[in-house]
Amino acid sequence: MSAFNNFVNFVANIVAPMQRQFINFVRIAICIVMVWIGGLKVCQYEADGIAHFVSNSPFFSYMYKKGPNLVDDGTGKMVMEYTLHKNPEGKMVAKNIEWHKENGTYTASYIIGATIVTVGLLTLSGIWFPVSGMAGGLLTFGMSIVTLSFMITTPEIWVPNLGGDMPTPAHGFPYLSAVGRLIVKDVIMMAGGLVAAAECANRILARRKAI
């Protein structure tokens, strides 16, 4: 037991002084994710790929002209219009792309992407500038709340029951689809944003006390 305690103390003595560096790594990680994903919002496939989030969201659906509209899918079933114009990743369908242009899909994606990149850079700036870093961390937290709200508003979050030649018991809540598994990870971004913001806030207060 003594050997184990000595090992724990050895590791703790190495890790403890590196707290600031680890928090900076959190900032770098947040920035990488946000700049990469935000930057991809200028790409057609990524813009098309967020149509289900935007169309179903009470916070973002106003950005689209047609996506949230209910239309007949040709079988008498009323569905949201965006569902008739999905482009699978890696597949280019001209009529769907034209619809997305008319819908404002790409313009909305550019705005969302620019916002995400900005928040990522603000969070990264906390390494050197605590005020902007605190803002970035809090915005990361807020953005994560909005993203996680998609789990309530977006039907594609859950595995659908598509039928088959045998029962499909694993569908609906709590069975996350690939889309849902992507979104739920924003809980980590939310926590990281708060950690980054709190560390910046402590530096701001420490500097003001020193004056």
Swiss-Prot record:
Keywords: Cell membrane, Membrane, Transmembrane, Transmembrane helix. The keyword tRNA processing does not apply. The chain crosses the membrane at residues 22-42, 111-131, 133-153. It is a multi-pass membrane protein. The keyword GTP-binding does not apply. GO terms for biological process: response to hypochlorite. It is found in: Cell membrane. Its main location: membrane. Signal peptide: none annotated. One of its GO terms (cellular component) is plasma membrane. To E.coli YkgB. PANTHER family: INNER MEMBRANE PROTEIN RCLC (PTHR40106:SF1). This is Uncharacterized 23.0 kDa protein in purT/mpa1 5'region. It comes from Mannheimia haemolytica.
